[in-house]
């Protein structure tokens, strides 16, 4: 506002205020500021693209994912996931998700299938606070068993202070990493907290805590924390140090990775060109590489690595496609000694060219 006090026709001032409102979650005020910008600067490219970004955020879309994973424990999995999201206003969104997953082991000839159905709502009852609830059912079918289990994912997201993000939630899911786990019908009740703190001098700190109570009477504590530095903003380039701690109440290594103590430390580097901000007919990408050591109970340290990549193309303001891949030998993501690999294809298509409600 001080900028506009000096020059009511300042382009940087008007669009800067629109961006500030948007970053604070005040969509209506942001739209008013960008509309004022376009009144003064007709068809200005940056302002038009900013308006497109807001409209796209509230436009119904379909997202399809196909993935294939395998590890050196002879487990393979194929998965498809379909999501339809329909914003009804700047505050309310409804969605539905269907996921099919088939897992098998080439040595034991054991296989299993799961079908997940979910319905969800999102409600933004304050510019800086939102609530999400997804409820559904998973139907599992293997060589030896068939059952249904309840799925729940619910959480609050908030921005308590500038440059800070907080998420508190509960998630109930079924262990479906491989056929043996599906056979055991283990459901997990996860209570979690995510917290990210940014700064004006490029340093950031992310922390995640999970407490998990399982239906096999086991429980888990998980702490992950990351201290990082933002080297660049376009594209985003950041790097830092990650630490992870896991502790299970009971050790059942024949069933799943469940150490009494697990510690891992790694250095990571990430580069990102965000699909949300690139213009149509542009490439986008993300790569995250990390290496370090893990310590499983009293065993000697083990070298670890992790590579995650995504590469895609935005064909238009409504359609984008990307491929992605992961390779990791970190025990906490699979099981002790495993090397996990996943490749996939993702498509996101805006069903219309604008929101289905009057965006004001």
Residue ranges and their predicted role:
Residues 1-360:
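Gram-negative and organellar
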């Amino acid at each position: 506002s001080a900028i506009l006090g000096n020059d009511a026709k300042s382009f940087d001032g008007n669009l800067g205020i629109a961006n500030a409102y948007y970053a604070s979650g005040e969509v209506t005020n942001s739209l008013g500021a960008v509309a004022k910008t376009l009144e003064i600067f007709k068809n200005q490219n940056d302002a038009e693209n900013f308006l497109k970004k807001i409209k796209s955020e509230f436009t119904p879309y379909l997202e399809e994912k196909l993935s294939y994973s395998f590890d050196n424990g002879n487990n393979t999995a194929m998965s498809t996931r379909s999501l339809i999201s329909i914003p009804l206003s700047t505050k309310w969104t409804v969605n539905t998700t269907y996921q099919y997953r088939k897992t098998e082991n080439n040595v034991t000839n054991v296989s299993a299938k799961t079908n997940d159905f979910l319905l969800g709502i999102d409600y933004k009852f304050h510019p800086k606070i939102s609530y999400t609830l997804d409820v559904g059912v998973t139907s599992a079918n293997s060589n030896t068993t068939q059952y249904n289990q309840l799925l729940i994912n619910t959480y609050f997201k908030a921005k308590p202070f500038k440059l800070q993000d907080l998420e508190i939630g509960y998630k109930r899911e079924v262990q479906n990493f491989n056929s043996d786990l599906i056979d055991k019908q283990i459901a997990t009740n996860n209570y979690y907290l995510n917290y990210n703190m940014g700064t004006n001098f490029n340093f950031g700190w992310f922390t995640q805590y999970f407490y998990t109570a399982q239906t096999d009477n086991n429980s888990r504590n998980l702490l992950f924390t990351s201290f990082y530095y933002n080297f660049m903003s376009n594209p985003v380039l950041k790097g830092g140090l990650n630490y992870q701690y896991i502790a299970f109440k009971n050790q059942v290594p024949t069933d799943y990775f469940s150490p009494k103590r697990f510690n891992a430390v790694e250095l990571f580097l990430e580069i990102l060109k965000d699909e949300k901000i690139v213009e149509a007919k542009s490439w986008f990408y993300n790569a995250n590489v990390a290496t370090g050591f893990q310590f499983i109970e009293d065993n000697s340290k083990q070298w670890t690595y992790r590579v995650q990549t995504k590469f895609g193309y935005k064909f238009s303001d409504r359609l984008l496609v990307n491929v992605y891949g992961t390779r990791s030998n970190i025990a906490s993501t699979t099981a002790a000694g495993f090397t996990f690999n996943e490749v996939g294809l993702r498509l996101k298509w805006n069903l219309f060219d604008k929101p289905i409600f009057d965006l004001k």
